[in-house]
C-alpha cells in the first residue's frame, strides 16, 4: 500500500511542475499522474485549484524570501555577500515561472509584490548596517534588486568563476 500523500507533498510537486513547465502544469490530473495517485487525493487536501494556487504562492514566499533571509542571517558574518552568492547562484526557474504567472493573475501579482517589498526592505537593512544613509541605502537596494531581477529573467546562469567576479563587483558598487 502506498504511503498517504500530504498537502505538503502536493505543494512540493506543484512547485517542481511550475518551475519546469509553467502555470499550465498546475492541474490536478497531470500532478496526480506524476505522483502515481488519483486526483481524489488532490481534492482531499485542497478545496479547488484556487486553494492549491494560494498554497503554492504562500510556500514560494516562504522559500524565496524568509528561508533565504533566515539562512543568510544564521550562517554569515557578511550577510550581503552571502545573500548575493545565494540568490545569484541559485536556480531561478521557479522565480521566472511565478513572475510569468503574475503577469495575468491578481493573486500571483500580489504575492510577487509582497516578496519584492520584503526583499527590498531586507537589502536596504543590510546596506544600512554597512553604514549607508537611509536614502542611499534605499536607492542602492532598488538598483541591486533590479540587477537581480534582470539576472533572474535573463536565462542560463553565468559560469561560476565569472559569476563570482560579477558578484564582487556588484558588492563594491552598492557598498561604496
What annotation goes with each model-predicted range?
Residues 23, 132-133, 176:
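Helix N-cap/coil-helix junction residues
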Residues 13-17, 86, 147:
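Short amphipathic alpha-helical elements of helix-turn-helix/winged-helix folds
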Residues 57-64:
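Short, basic, alpha-helical segments at the C-terminal edge of helix-turn-helix-like DNA-binding modules
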Residues 65, 90-97, 106-142, 165:
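Amphipathic alpha-helical packing segments from all-alpha helical-bundle domains
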Residues 93, 99, 134-172:
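Hydrophobic alpha-helical segments that form the core
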Residues 6-9, 13-51, 55:
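Helix-turn-helix
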Residues 66-97, 144:
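Hydrophobic alpha-helical connector segments
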Residues 1-5:
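N-terminal intrinsically disordered/low-complexity leader segments
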Amino acid at each position: 500500500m502506498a504511503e498517504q500523500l500530504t498537502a505538503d507533498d502536493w505543494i512540493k510537486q506543484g512547485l517542481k511542475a511550475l518551475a519546469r513547465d509553467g502555470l499550465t502544469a498546475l492541474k490536478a490530473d497531470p500532478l496526480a499522474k506524476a505522483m502515481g495517485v488519483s486526483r481524489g487525493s488532490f481534492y482531499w487536501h485542497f478545496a479547488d485549484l484556487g486553494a492549491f494556487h494560494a498554497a503554492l504562492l504562500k510556500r514560494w514566499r516562504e522559500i524565496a524570501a524568509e528561508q533565504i533571509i533566515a539562512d543568510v542571517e544564521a550562517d554569515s558574518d557578511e550577510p550581503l555577500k552571502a545573500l548575493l552568492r545565494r540568490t545569484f547562484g541559485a536556480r531561478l526557474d521557479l522565480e521566472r515561472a511565478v513572475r510569468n504567472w503574475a503577469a495575468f493573475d491578481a493573486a500571483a501579482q500580489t504575492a510577487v509584490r509582497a516578496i519584492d517589498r520584503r526583499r527590498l526592505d531586507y537589502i536596504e537593512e543590510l546596506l544600512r548596517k554597512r553604514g549607508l544613509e537611509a536614502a542611499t541605502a534605499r536607492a542602492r537596494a532598488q538598483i541591486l534588486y533590479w540587477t537581480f531581477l534582470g539576472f533572474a529573467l535573463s536565462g542560463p546562469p553565468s559560469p561560476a568563476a565569472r559569476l563570482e567576479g560579477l558578484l564582487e563587483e556588484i558588492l563594491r558598487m552598492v557598498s561604496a
